[in-house]
A protein has these predicted regions:
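Active-site-proximal alpha-helical scaffold in enzymes
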Residues: 76-88, 138-142, 146-190, 228-249, ...
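ACP-dependent fatty acid/polyketide chain-elongation machinery
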Residues: 1-63, 242-252, 350-363, 407-411
Length: 411
């Protein structure tokens, strides 16, 4: 039986470019959400987002190539390079066919679509860039990342809205189990802090209208009123255990379970009581031969919307019963905002680092408890805990539920 471990992490987030900066700021309870700087929001109802303000694409990509890439692809390439460097793994002609890439995105090149549609309307069809389509289509998250690092194994992009990154990592885990690859580059990326992105989610009444950027994303609280849009990418290097051991790789955690279900309920709302999420959690536990009482930490989807947080809390209680109250449950979206298709990538990385270092990041802005959300949400301060098993939950529009289970690696 093949086993799969996490050996590399690359992060580009509103908390900073690079794993170390993001992780430190997360543990310190910092918030990467602020007033939007990418465009004028004066005519919008929402003025805040989690932007990646310290990202310079030229640190990762040749200047002449940047204009051919949507921002979501730039993030994916950068996080992939960061993850491979962290794993100390070099792709060579000899191993390239055994290295695959699965990077999800919920929306793709929205910045490119806006830019080129504006040209089409204002200047006519001849002014539309020949790079419009390849820069915008979602599969270029994986396509471009694989091109830039030379990975020739399984290559695809998963599109399941806010579950995209988690499904990508789960599918990569299965690819290694099935011996389709020895190493997989997997995660999610998103760049939708754009005029139409903000307007679309705002008009859907999905976004918080709280004017205070540092307090607006407040998962599980009584006065939560919607999520805050974020951008960035999170990429993991997954590796077959013996392959990793042979090269002396650092192991963050072992990937042991993956659950995926559908609600068949509503386009944007979760099923009542989180029924679909509960089934996905059970599926991940069963694959990993995990006893419910072994789970010590859950990185919840925790979007800060009234419906999600209540129903996800109920799903956790349905699966774990009284043990649910002993689990540290957090939502790191209070700090990063919601990266949509990128969320599962960064949150799986947070789970792996939490297990590796024995520390649970906080859920910030916990100052107004909701009686319907009554679990232990690691309020406001990081907490040390020896984590045997942890979960990362992602639940997407369309009723997509994806759960990853990681275990502390002990040999």
């Amino acid at each position: 039986m093949r086993r799969v471990v996490v050996t590399g992490i690359g992060l580009i987030t509103p908390l900073g470019t690079g794993k170390e900066k993001t992780w430190k700021n997360l543990l310190d309870g910092k918030c990467g959400i602020d007033k939007i700087t990418a465009f004028d929001t004066s005519e919008h109802t929402v003025h805040i987002a989690g932007e990646v303000n310290d990202f310079n694409p030229e640190d990762y990509i040749e200047k002449k190539e940047i204009k051919k890439l949507g921002r979501f692809s730039q993030f994916a390439i950068a996080a992939t390079k960061e993850a491979l460097a962290d794993a100390k793994f070099e792709i060579t002609p000899e191993n390239a066919e055994r290295v695959g890439t699965i990077i999800g995105s919920g929306i793709g090149g929205l910045d490119i679509i806006e830019q080129e549609i504006t040209k089409l309307v204002e200047k006519g069809p001849k002014k539309v860039s020949p790079f419009y389509i390849p820069a915008a289509i979602l599969n270029m998250a994986s396509g471009n990342a694989s091109i830039y690092v030379g990975a020739k194994g399984p290559n695809k992009t998963v599109v399941t809205a806010c579950a995209s990154g988690t499904n990508s990592i789960g599918d990569a885990f299965q690819a290694i189990l099935l011996n389709k690859a020895d190493v997989m580059i997997a995660g999610g990326t998103e760049a939708t802090v754009t005029p139409s992105g903000i307007a679309g989610f705002a008009n859907l009444k999905a976004l918080s209208t709280n004017p205070d950027p540092k307090k607006a994303s407040r998962p599980f609280t009584a006065d939560r009123d919607g999520f805050v849009l974020g951008e960035g990418a999170g990429i993991l290097v997954l590796e077959e255990l013996e392959h990793a051991k042979k090269r002396g790789a650092k192991i963050y955690a072992e990937v042991v379970g993956y659950g995926e279900t559908g609600d068949a309920y509503h386009m944007t709302a979760p099923s009542d009581g989180g029924e679909g999420a509960a089934r996905a959690i059970k599926m991940a536990l069963e694959q990993g031969n995990i006893k419910p009482e072994e789970v010590g930490y859950i990185n919840a989807h925790g979007t800060s919307t009234p419906a999600n947080d209540k129903n996800e809390t109920q799903a956790i209680k349905t699966v774990f019963g009284e043990h649910a109250y002993k689990i540290g449950v957090n939502s790191t979206k209070g700090s990063t905002g919601h990266l949509l298709g990128g969320a599962g990538g960064i949150e799986a990385a947070f789970l792996a680092m939490a297990i590796d270092e024995g520390v649970m990041p906080p859920t910030i802005n916990q100052d107004n408890p909701d009686p319907a959300c009554d679990l232990y949400y690691i309020p406001n301060k990081a907490e040390k805990r020896d984590i045997e098993v942890g979960l990362s939950n992602s639940l997407g529009f369309g009723g997509h539920n994806a759960i990853l289970a990681f275990r502390k690696y002990k040999g």
